[in-house]
């Protein structure tokens, strides 16, 4: 039973990692930019969720506002920070992204305080259900359901709709896609809108899971998301999804059997190092 419980716990965290890391993969696949500021959007979504939920008593409204604000923030980051420097050397957008993330962290500290905000009412934090002997909180169940629905929805969008096929074509060969009438600028906006909305929702869910939100909460998650993107193969959405779930399960087992040696985050990065020693291109990256 412990084995099954650890697998389930790992998959739950893997779903959360996937919601965060997919946005990074989408941006890298399209623009070849390591979008570090994505972690700031994650924290922004968490703050919007807790602020609106505490003010109105409605978690649903909190998530709705977080999704919209995060999506708008993502589009603004692309339009104001990335679009003017797309033709610069590759390190320039990365430096800008890191600087923007630091600015966002400090802004959260100034606006919301340095010690974080707790949810006034969070019944999901303690309420749980028992599934075949495994206790799961409502937050964990919601995390799995929302991540599956959103990621499957994105897969259907990318595979079945004209806009989704245009997005895939732009990622594969932007010049060829443009010659067939695909607007690359519109594709980039959709890319940032969807990826940022996912990050905002993930931030709200992690805030619920921890029952509080703090200015630096995006830091550790951003490092983990970057590790997942590399582990899955840079630019591979499918690789990112698989790497997220695998890393979640590895961390769950490591937190039990290696707790006296490594903490949970260290286990994840150790696993990344081992995999990259064997497959430098990542799980599904091209050699």
Which residues make up each language-model segment?
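Inter-helical junctions in multi-pass inner-membrane proteins, predominant
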Residues: 1-16, 157-162, 191-229, 252-265
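Membrane-interfacial amphipathic/re-entrant helices at transmembrane-helix boundaries
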Residues: 1-20, 48, 59-62, 88-94, ...
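Membrane-embedded helix boundary and interhelical linker motif in transport proteins
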Residues: 8, 30-76, 80
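Short, non-helical or kinked segments that cap or interrupt transmembrane helices
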Residues: 15, 24-46, 87-92, 163-166, ...
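Alpha-helical transmembrane segments within multi-pass membrane transporters and channels
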Residues: 57-101, 107, 242-247, 251, ...
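Hydrophobic alpha-helical transmembrane segments of polytopic membrane proteins
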Residues: 70, 224-247, 251, 270-278
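Transmembrane helix-bundle core of multi-pass membrane transporters
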Residues: 84-160, 187-190, 211, 256, ...
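Helix-loop-helix "hairpin" substructures at the membrane interface of multi-pass membrane proteins
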Residues: 132-213, 237-242
């Amino acid at each position: 039973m412990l084995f099954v419980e650890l697998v389930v716990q790992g998959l739950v965290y893997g779903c959360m990692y996937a919601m965060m890391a997919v946005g990074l993969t989408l941006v890298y696949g399209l623009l070849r930019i390591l979008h570090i500021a994505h972690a700031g959007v994650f924290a922004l979504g968490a703050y919007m969720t807790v602020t609106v939920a505490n003010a109105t008593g409605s978690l649903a409204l909190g998530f709705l506002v977080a999704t919209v604000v995060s999506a708008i923030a993502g589009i603004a980051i692309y339009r104001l920070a990335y679009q003017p420097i797309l033709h610069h050397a590759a390190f320039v957008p990365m430096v800008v992204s890191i600087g923007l993330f630091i600015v966002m962290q400090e802004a959260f500290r100034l606006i919301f305080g340095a010690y974080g905000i707790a949810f006034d009412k969070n019944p999901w934090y303690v309420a749980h259900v028992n599934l075949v002997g495994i206790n799961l909180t409502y937050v964990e169940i919601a995390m799995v359901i929302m991540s599956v629905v959103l990621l499957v929805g994105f897969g259907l969008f990318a595979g079945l709709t004209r806009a989704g096929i245009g997005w895939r074509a732009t990622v594969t060969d932007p010049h060829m896609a443009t010659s067939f009438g695909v607007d690359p600028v519109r594709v980039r906006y959709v890319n940032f809108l969807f990826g940022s909305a996912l990050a905002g929702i993930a931030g709200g869910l992690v805030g619920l899971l921890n029952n509080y939100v703090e200015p630096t909460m995006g830091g550790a998650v951003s490092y983990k998301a970057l590790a997942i993107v590399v582990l899955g193969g840079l630019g591979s959405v499918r690789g990112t999804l698989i790497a997220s779930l695998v890393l979640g399960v590895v961390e769950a087992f490591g937190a039990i059997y290696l707790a006296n040696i490594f903490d949970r985050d260290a286990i994840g990065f150790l696993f990344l190092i081992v995999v990259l020693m064997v497959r430098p291109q990542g799980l599904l990256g091209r050699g």
